[in-house]
Amino acid sequence: MAASFSGPSMIMEEEGRFEAEVAEVQAWWNSERFKLTRRPYTARDVVALRGNLKQSYASNELAKKLWRTLKTHQANGTASRTFGALDPVQVTMMAKHLDSIYVSGWQCSSTHTTTNEPGPDLADYPYDTVPNKVEHLFFAQQYHDRKQREARMSMSREERARTPYVDYLKPIIADGDTGFGGTTATVKLCKLFVERGAAGVHIEDQSSVTKKCGHMAGKVLVAISEHINRLVAARLQFDVMGVETLLVARTDAEAANLIQSNVDTRDHQFILGVTNPNLRGKSLATLLATGMANGKTGAELQATEDNWLAMAQLKTFPECVMDAIKNMNAGEDEKRRRMNEWMNHTSYDKCLSYEQGREIADRMGLKNLFWDWDLPRTREGFYRFKGSVMAAVVRGRAFAPHADIIWMETAKPDFAECTAFAEGVKSMHPEIMLAYNLSPSFNWDASGMTDEQMRDFIPRIARLGFCWQFITLGGFHADALVIDTFAKDYARRGMLAYVERIQREERKNGVDTLAHQKWSGANYYDRYLKTVQGGISSTAAMGKGVTEEQFKETWTRPGAMEMGSAGSEVVAKARM
């Protein structure tokens, strides 16, 4: 309970409690769980942000479980594989086969926003949308766990031994998009996720204003330092709440073509500039503004931009220098020597600033290179960016001390890219865990892989360190496929379509929704009714007359299309 601190002795008690809690937090940080984590703040800062009333969160137990699961996979060179869950039906079916659950912002944006207004993945839905979906699924997990316990404790030991146990409490990793704004927005979002049941949260390095699905065009990155601030804000909130929620840092740098600012020198080597001196003083933004003032619209403005970019000869500054060396009036040996000198000073992992690169170029005699990164800025003020795996590696290395897992969003399922990213990040952070999006946005059949290579893709990149792998929209696509094909067949064949495609398949595969009243917990709440009323209730939902009794016995239907040896088919079996 919170105490009142007024007199001198109470003041000392207040300080004593504070210092004890600071020591407790410091000991927690010194544990194996956080040995790789860097914090730019102190335990004292964290405790000062806490209230006097200590709270605990169920999601913290699942965060610890997720950590153990992923570290085990990492040690074994395997992966936790999962996909985006849409609803309680999916999350309970997944629990029987998978060891983690994903909640996708794309799926929420298209199917379950808090305003009920669907749309594409632009992160323009209310920021409690994904936390609310997490709570929806987390409540379902807990409910089915309670329901199973009641059912099992109503069985004999022999019955329990014959009955498979399902761990419904699989940890949830949720989509935190870009953190939904500034530091305070990220802090409040992460607080919601912990309260609603998330064991892990991922945050990406796109601009929150222009955020898009990772497989759309027009992605705008924020500076490395800005995204680190987001990660620090998330970690601080987790520390204040005393939880071990896993933090996943995602980078979209592999395919991004714009960046919000050039404030971070680590980004400089990937920013594009104009190398055509004929465009000196003729910025693209000014040209477009003039065109609009003169009445140009749409296609005309696009043509103006396309023509300007074609003339601009955009390059990064390192590319500009290397091209200048190649075009020097010197022998091949001298060019090779200059190129080696440049590369030795400016390899991408050194992350030299533009100013440092310009100084080195000047020393090499390349003093009059024309290169301007302001001229090609967009109408919105964004810089042009050359996305690549190298850019993602630089960001992954920078994010690793502040996150538990690093994820590079990619444009295609490319093993060589996965290898380059894993080796690049792990060369500096060998113990960091990696994640991979097995995206349905990829046309896997056009990837050039054989069926065997597709089957082996997950274990193959798992050996590189990608210990958490997921199909973001797996639930969405599975739902659409089943409903579309069933609706079409049902419109044509009526109840036979339902019986053949759904009911018999549920029975054949042991899907527990066959007995949907029991799946929904009717027996569980009958137990409540009977407990309240002394062990008997005339209004129990699963009492005499419930139609689900039809599924308890085994009988045969003569003349079935798929006949057994006796010319009949088993169409129902007793299920517990």
From Swiss-Prot:
Keyword Metal-binding: yes
Gene3D superfamilies, alphabetized: 1.10.10.850, Phosphoenolpyruvate-binding domains (3.20.20.60)
EC number(s) given by UniProt: 4.1.3.1
Residues that, per the record, bind Mg(2+): D175
Catalytic reactions on record: D-threo-isocitrate = glyoxylate + succinate
Coiled-coil stretches noted in the UniProt entry, renumbered to this chain: none
Motif (Microbody targeting signal): 574-576
GO-annotated cellular components: glyoxysome
Residues that hold substrate according to the record: S104, G105, W106, G214, H215, R250, N437, L438, S439, P440, S441, T472
Annotated function: Involved in storage lipid mobilization during the growth of higher plant seedling.
PANTHER family documented for this protein: BIFUNCTIONAL GLYOXYLATE CYCLE PROTEIN (PTHR21631:SF3), ISOCITRATE LYASE/MALATE SYNTHASE (PTHR21631)
Designated name of the protein: Isocitrate lyase
